[in-house]
Amino acid sequence: MKRYVFMLSDGTGITAETLGNSLITQFENIQFEKITIPYIDSTHRAESVVLRINQCFSEQGTKPLVFMTLVDPEIRQAIKKAHACVFDLFSIFIGPLENELEEKSSYTVGRTHGVANVKSYSHRIEAIDFALSHDDGIKTRGYDKADIILIGVSRCGKTPSCLYMALQYGILAANYPFTEEDLVGFRLPEVLRPYKPKLFGLTIDAQRLQQIRSERRPNSKYASAEQCRLEVTEVEAMYQRENIPYINSTKYSIEEISTKVLAIAGLQRKI
C-alpha cells in the first residue's frame, strides 16, 4: 500500500517533517511518498497546494495525509478544504497552551527556525565552523575549547555526529580518526592525552564497517574484513584500558548517536 504524505509549512518545513516522520515511521507495512512544501505564506499559494493534494487523491483514490504547521488561520482553513486527512499540528497545541498560560499567541511565522535570537544563531554558526575546522584531526590546536572530542576508526559516524551536535545543540565538537599507523602497538595518541576528559569513543560492528568502507574504496586493504576486525578490536581494547566512555554506533541514526553521546557525557544544549 502506498500513501502520499504532504508536510506543509509557512516556514522551513523542518517541524512538520520532524513530527510527521516521527508518526508515519510507526507504520512499517505502508510505503509513503513524502512531499514537503515550505513557505506557504498566502491563501493563493495554499490554494495551489490544495490542487496538488486533490490531484494525488484523484490519481490514487485514497486521501493523502497532510501534516501542517501553519500559523495563519485563513491559510490553515484553505488547506483543510483539500480531499485529505489533515493534521493541524499548530492548532492542536496552541489552544491548550493559550488556556494554560492565559495569554494569546503572537501568531508569528517562522519563530522556531528563524533568527529571532541573534546570540543563539551566532553561537550555532560558531559551533558549525568549529566542527568543520576540527574535523578528521585536521587541526588539533583549539581542542582546549572543545566541549567534546569524538574518537574512533574511520567511517564510524564521527563527522556527521559532530556537525549534528553543532547545528542542533551549539556544542563545540571536534573529532579525531585513528589511522592504520596508529594501530601498530596501539595506544592513545599523545596529542589526545591532554584532553582525555573530553574524549568520547565511537565503535561499530566490523561487518558494518566493511560494508561502509567497501562503498568508498572497494577491494582495498582499508575495506577488508580482516582490517576492519583488527581496527575495531584494537580501538575497543584501548577505550577499556583508558576508561574512555564509548558507544557502538552500528544500529543508531546520527540523531540517536548524538543524543546518547551528550547524555552520557553530561553536556547540555547551548542554543
UniProtKB/Swiss-Prot annotation:
Keywords: Kinase, Nucleotide-binding, Serine/threonine-protein kinase, Transferase. It is an enzyme of class 2 (transferase). GO terms for molecular function: ADP binding; ATP binding; phosphotransferase activity, phosphate group as acceptor; protein serine/threonine kinase activity. It holds the Pfam family Kinase-PPPase. It catalyses: [pyruvate, water dikinase] + ADP = [pyruvate, water dikinase]-phosphate + AMP + H(+); [pyruvate, water dikinase]-phosphate + phosphate + H(+) = [pyruvate, water dikinase] + diphosphate. It comes from the Bacteria. Its EC number is 2.7.11.33, 2.7.4.28. ADP binds at G152, V153, S154, R155, C156, G157, K158, T159. It comes from Legionella pneumophila (strain Paris). Belongs to the pyruvate, phosphate/water dikinase regulatory protein family. PSRP subfamily. InterPro entries: Kinase-pyrophosphorylase, PSRP. This is Putative phosphoenolpyruvate synthase regulatory protein. NCBIfam families: PRK05339.1 (NF003742).
